[in-house]
From Swiss-Prot:
Catalytic activity: K(+)(in) + H(+)(in) = K(+)(out) + H(+)(out)
Keyword hit for Cell inner membrane: yes
PANTHER family for the chain: K+ POTASSIUM TRANSPORTER, OSMOTIC STRESS POTASSIUM TRANSPORTER
Role this protein plays: Transport of potassium into the cell. Likely operates as a K(+):H(+) symporter.
Pfam families attached to this UniProt entry: K_trans (PF02705), K_trans_C (PF22776)
Name this protein carries in UniProt: Probable potassium transport system protein Kup 2
Subcellular localization: Cell inner membrane
Gene Ontology MF terms: potassium ion transmembrane transporter activity; symporter activity
Main location (coarse class): membrane
Signal peptide: none
C-alpha cells in the first residue's frame, strides 16, 4: 500500500515537472514585458508601484489561482479542458442550447487563432530585445534575429517536437528558478515592496487615480496572459499536476520576479526601458538573454501546439472545413501538425513583428484577445455552475464578482483598440466568418439530405420484399456527417441499380465528450435484409483511422455474413455545389460561393478517414444551393 502511494506521488511530481514545459510557458514569460508595460502609464513613486504590485498580486490570486484552478477546473469534460470541452458539457446538459452557444464557441476559436499569432510574436520579440540592454548598438538586430527564430520555429513544426520536447521542462524549471532568484535579490534590498500584498494599496490606487486607473488594468492584465492554458492543457496533465506546478514553482517565481522589478524601479527611479533585464547583473545578462529566448520559444511552441489541437477538434466537430492532419509522433497521439494552419500562423506572426516592431507596441494588441477568451470561459462556466451544478445564489454572486473584475480589465483594454487591439478582433472576426459560413453550408446540405431521405424511403421497402436484384459481395459505404443515414448513397444506388448482397453503411458520430470507451463505440442497426447501418462514435479529441476502427468493429459487432478484410471496397461521396442566384435563409450569395470554395478545397474523405486508395471508390454528387 505504501509503495503504491509513493509511486502515485512520483507520477504526480513527474507530471507536474512535465507541465512546466507546456502549461506555464506563456504565463511564465510574461515578466519579460508585462511590468515594463504597466509602469509607463504613471510616475514612479511608492504609492503607484505599491498599487501596481498589489493589482498584480491579487490578479494572479483571484483570476488564475481561484477562478481557474479552483472553479473552472471543476467544469472539465471527462478530464479535458478548453472552450470546446466546455461547450460539450453544456450540450450534454442542455439538449438544444440555441445559436448563442455556437456563436460563443466560434468566437472563442477565432480568438485562439489570434493568440497563436500574437504569443510567439510578443514573447520572442521581448526576449530578443534584451540585446538592447547588452548594447544599444545591437538594437538594429532585434527584428532580423526575431524573424529568423520565428522562421525556424514554424519550420520545425512539420517534424514535431518529440526529440527535443524532453528538454522543455528542465529549461522552464531553470527559467523559473532564475527569475525567482533575481527578483528575490532585489526584494531583500528593498523589502518594503512586500507591503503591496495588502489589497489596501490596490484600492487606494483607484481612489487616487479614479477612472485613469482603468488604463493601468490593461497593462496589469498582461501578467495573466497564458492563464487560460492552465485549463486548456488539463487533459494532458490532470488537475493535481497543474495545481502542484503552479503553487509550488510558477506562482512563487512570478511573484518574486514582479516584486523584484518593483523594488528595482523604486531604487533606480531613472527611466528603465526594460526592467526585467535590469534585474540581471551585467556579467549574467548574455546568459539571461539566451535563457529568455529559449523560454519564449518553448512558450510559443506550447500555444502553436494548442492551436493545432483545438482546430483539429473543431475540424472533427465540423466547425471548420476538414484540414490535413499530420501525426508527428508514433507514441503521442495528441501531437499533430496542420500544414495550412501552420502557414497562416507563421505569416500572421511574422507580419505582426514587422508591423509593430517592439514588444511594447505589440502589448496593446495582445491583452484584449486573451481578455475576451477569459470572459468567454467565465460565461460558459457560469452557465454550467447554474444549470449543471445547481449553485445557489451566494455562489453565483462570487462568480459574478469574478466576471465584474474581468469586465473591468476589459474596460481597461478598450482604449487599446485604437493602438493595435483591433487586430485580434479582426482575426477572430475573419475566423468567425469562415466557421459560420461553413456551418450554414453544412446545415443546407443536411436539409437537402433530409429531402432525399423522403425520396429514397421506398428502397428500404423494396429491399425487405426482395424486389431488387443484387450482385454477390459486400459494399462498405462511408456516410458524411451531414448525411444522417446515407441518403445520398442510397440515391446513387437507386439511380444505378447496383446493389450488393450485403451493404454496410458506416456513419461517424463525433460526441460532446473527449473520449468514447470501446464498449460504447459501435452501434448496429438493421435497416433491411442484407442492409446494415453502423454508427462509430468518437470523442472530439480522438484520432480517426477508419480501417483500424472497422477491424475492431468486426470483432465486436455481429454481422450475419463473412467479412474478407483485404477485399473490402469503400464507397465515399464527393460533393459538388452548384450556385444559384437566390439568397437563401441564413446564407448570402457571397457565402454560398465561399462555401463552395471551401468544400472544393477541404481534405477529401479518403485522406480524412485514412482509407486505402486502391480500395476506395468516390461517387460525385451535385447539390444546388
Amino acid at each position: 500500500m505504501m509503495n503504491e502511494s509513493l509511486t502515485e506521488k512520483r507520477n504526480e511530481l513527474s507530471l507536474s515537472f512535465a507541465a512546466l514545459g507546456v502549461v506555464f510557458g506563456d504565463i511564465g514569460t510574461s515578466p519579460l514585458y508585462a511590468f515594463g508595460q504597466v509602469i509607463k502609464y504613471f510616475p514612479i513613486n511608492d504609492h503607484n508601484i505599491y498599487g501596481i504590485l498589489s493589482l498584480i498580486f491579487w490578479s494572479l490570486i483571484i483570476i488564475v489561482s481561484i477562478k481557474y484552478l479552483v472553479i473552472v477546473f471543476r467544469a472539465d469534460n471527462d478530464g479535458e479542458g478548453g472552450i470546446i470541452a466546455l461547450a460539450g458539457v453544456i450540450r450534454q446538459k442542455i439538449k438544444q442550447p440555441g445559436g448563442w452557444l455556437l456563436f460563443i464557441t466560434l468566437v472563442g476559436i477565432g480568438l485562439i487563432i489570434g493568440d497563436g499569432m500574437l504569443t510567439p510574436a510578443i514573447s520572442i520579440l521581448s526576449a530578443v530585445e534584451g540585446l538592447e540592454s547588452l548594447s544599444p548598438n545591437l538594437a538594429k538586430y532585434v527584428l532580423p534575429v526575431t524573424l529568423i527564430i520565428l522562421f525556424f520555429l514554424f519550420k520545425m513544426q512539420s517534424i514535431g517536437t518529440g526529440k527535443i520536447g524532453v528538454y522543455f521542462a528542465p529549461v522552464m524549471l531553470v527559467w523559473f528558478i532564475t527569475i525567482g532568484i533575481l527578483g528575490f535579490l532585489q526584494i531583500i534590498q528593498n523589502p518594503k515592496v512586500l507591503m503591496a500584498i495588502n489589497p489596501y494599496y490596490a484600492i487606494n490606487f483607484f481612489m487616487i487615480h479614479k477612472y485613469l486607473a482603468l488604463f493601468i488594468l490593461g497593462g496589469v492584465f498582461l501578467v495573466m496572459t497564458g492563464g487560460e492554458a492552465l485549463f486548456a492543457d488539463l487533459g494532458h496533465f490532470g488537475k493535481k499536476a497543474i495545481r502542484t506546478g503552479w503553487f509550488a514553482v510558477a506562482l512563487p517565481a512570478l511573484l518574486l520576479c514582479y516584486f523584484g522589478q518593483g523594488a528595482l524601479v523604486l531604487m533606480h527611479t531613472e527611466d528603465i526601458k526594460y526592467p526585467f533585464f535590469s534585474l540581471s547583473p551585467d556579467w549574467f545578462l548574455p546568459v539571461m538573454i539566451i535563457l529568455a529566448t529559449l523560454a519564449t520559444i518553448i512558450a510559443s511552441q506550447a500555444i502553436i501546439s494548442a492551436a493545432f489541437s483545438i482546430l483539429k477538434q473543431a475540424s472533427l466537430l465540423n466547425l471548420i472545413p476538414r484540414l490535413k492532419i499530420v501525426f508527428t509522433s508514433k507514441f503521442e497521439k495528441g501531437e499533430v501538425y496542420l500544414p495550412l494552419i501552420n502557414f497562416i500562423l507563421a505569416l500572421g506572426t511574422c507580419s505582426l513583428v514587422v508591423i509593430f516592431k517592439s514588444s511594447s507596441n505589440l502589448a496593446d494588441a495582445y491583452g484584449i484577445a486573451v481578455n475576451l477568451d477569459m470572459l468567454i470561459t467565465t460565461v460558459l462556466v457560469g452557465i454550467i455552475a447554474y444549470r449543471c451544478w445547481s449553485w445557489h445564489a451566494f455562489k453565483i454572486l462570487i462568480f459574478l464578482l469574478i466576471l465584474i473584475i474581468e469586465l473591468a480589465f476589459f474596460a481597461g483594454n478598450i482604449p487599446k483598440l485604437l493602438t493595435g487591439g483591433w487586430i485580434p478582433i479582426l482575426i477572430a472576426f475573419l475566423g468567425f466568418v469562415v466557421m459560420y459560413t461553413w456551418h450554414c453550408g453544412f446545415e443546407k446540405l443536411r436539409e437537402l439530405h433530409h429531402r432525399d431521405a423522403l425520396m429514397d424511403a421506398f428502397i428500404i421497402d423494396e429491399l425487405n420484399q426482395n424486389k431488387i436484384s443484387r450482385q454477390p459481395g459486400m459494399g462498405l459505404y462511408i456516410i458524411d456527417p451531414y448525411d444522417c443515414e446515407g441518403e445520398s448513397l442510397l440515391h446513387h444506388l437507386r439511380l444505378n441499380r447496383i446493389f450488393f448482397e450485403n451493404m454496410v453503411f458506416v456513419s461517424i458520430k463525433i460526441e460532446n465528450k473527449p473520449y468514447i470507451p470501446i464498449e460504447d463505440k459501435f452501434e448496429l442497426i438493421k435497416k433491411a435484409e442484407g442492409f446494415y447501418l453502423i454508427f462509430i462514435h468518437y470523442g472530439f479529441t480522438e484520432n480517426i483511422n477508419l480501417p483500424n476502427e472497422l477491424d475492431e468493429m468486426f470483432k465486436r459487432v455481429y454481422l450475419p455474413f463473412d467479412v474478407i478484410k483485404n477485399k473490402l471496397i469503400y464507397f465515399i461521396e464527393i460533393v459538388f455545389v452548384e450556385m444559384t442566384g437566390e439568397r437563401q435563409k441564413h446564407m448570402y450569395l457571397w457565402q454560398k460561393h465561399f462555401f463552395s470554395l471551401m468544400i472544393r478545397n477541404a481534405v477529401p474523405d479518403i485522406q480524412f478517414y485514412q482509407l486505402p486508395y486502391n480500395n476506395t471508390i468516390a461517387i460525385g454528387t451535385y447539390y444546388q444551393f
